[in-house]
Amino acid sequence: MANHSFNLVTEPWIPVLADGKHESHSLETLFDQPTSIRQLDIADPLERVSIMRLLLAIMYAARQEGYSSPAGAKRIMEAGRDQEIIDYLHAWAHRFDLMSETEPFLQVAGMMPQGKPKDYGFTRLHPAMQRPLWQTHDPYKPVTPAEAARMLLVCNMYDVAGVHTGMAGDRKPREANVPHRGWRRPEDSLLPSSTETTCGRP
């Protein structure tokens, strides 16, 4: 079987406006050459905010102690790159592979739904696509790995509400939807945190 891979650290998947041109950058390029990038070139506001949240999460993870001083942050900003973020991406590149067989990005390898699997098609990848009237993507056109990565981010950050199909072997979807009610409002918050008994009652 072919060993498919699409690593978000090295593969271009983020649309940007750089030096007056429409381009696609990888995470590594985005952080390595930030001064040439004017802005994210994404029309969909959900995708744009989702990518911004990912970029912030990477920055905070790479610099858990923050910057030594405002002057230090200014020097890095003027230099146009932050080596600590680049090093972080290289160290954790294996966790950014969209198609990894063991640790796919923002997914669980081998996870299957309860019951018989269903093919929901393209629309489930993006909350805005739930109503075909408003979708801007041809549902019969294959989705590129870059598009799938952006839609996966949106789906993880802005998933639609409602009851979702549970994972095979997980009892929670069947048993966790019943709220515990107490005699008083504070007990409503306390009861779900208890193990067996609270206030002498099961």
Where are these regions (language model features)?
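Conserved small-residue
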Residues: 1-202
